[in-house]
Amino acid sequence: MAPTSAFLTALVLLSCNAICSLGCDLPQTHSLAHTRALRLLAQMRRISPFSCLDHRRDFGSPHEAFGGNQVQKAQAMALVHEMLQQTFQLFSTEGSAAAWNESLLHQFYTGLDQQLRDLEACVMQEAGLEGTPLLEEDSIRAVRKYFHRLTLYLQEKSYSPCAWEIVRAEVMRSFSSSRNLQDRLRKKE
């Protein structure tokens, strides 16, 4: 399988502490963005995840093959940007608008948009400092394929409430799991 930990690599850096420790000067408000996104995802839950257990699927979360020790700062931040972009696109579909509370979804979009703008400058800054290519093509492809699988699943399940719950939980679990890579990146410094 293609390098798949690009997903968690990217999500690790959603917290300000991880990004700031990597030398990127983001606004202090960015430090709360990761926590706020997780809180909003939790609040968006409309049905019990237990009622959807038979709908679960292995989406091949891109976290197993991408070694955290080999990730460079600029690459990790570029992956964060890609993950945020893909998450934004996933939750911006017409089916998403019908599935979630409009106010919570708007807050989620707004937070993702702000993080994307903050990271764009950060990615360029880190790429210039390291003088390295921003992303291995396999890593970016793994992230895109992962989100494509989530999108296909939603289509296959006709954007059902359980399908959205599975996708919401998948994204939330990945956001939460990202702290492991954050620790590895901090130890590298």
Curated annotation (Swiss-Prot):
State the organism of origin. Answer: Sus scrofa (Pig)
**CDD domains (UniProt xref):** IFab (cd00095)
Name of the protein described by the UniProt record: Interferon alpha-1
Quaternary state and partners of this protein? Interacts with CR2.
Signal peptide coordinates: 1-23
Name any Gene Ontology BP term: B cell activation involved in immune response
**Subcellular locations according to the entry:** Secreted
What the entry lists under SUPFAM superfamilies is as follows: 4-helical cytokines (SSF47266)
The record's PANTHER family line, in alphabetical order, gives: INTERFERON ALPHA-5, TYPE I INTERFERON
Q: Which cysteines are joined by disulfide bonds?
A: C24-C122, C52-C162
Gene3D superfamilies of this UniProt entry?
Answer: 1.20.1250.10
Q: Give the function comment from the record.
A: Produced by macrophages, IFN-alpha have antiviral activities. Interferon stimulates the production of two enzymes: a protein kinase and an oligoadenylate synthetase.
Q: Give the family per the record.
A: Belongs to the alpha/beta interferon family.
Name the UniProt key words of this record, in alphabetical order: Antiviral defense, Cytokine, Disulfide bond, Secreted, Signal
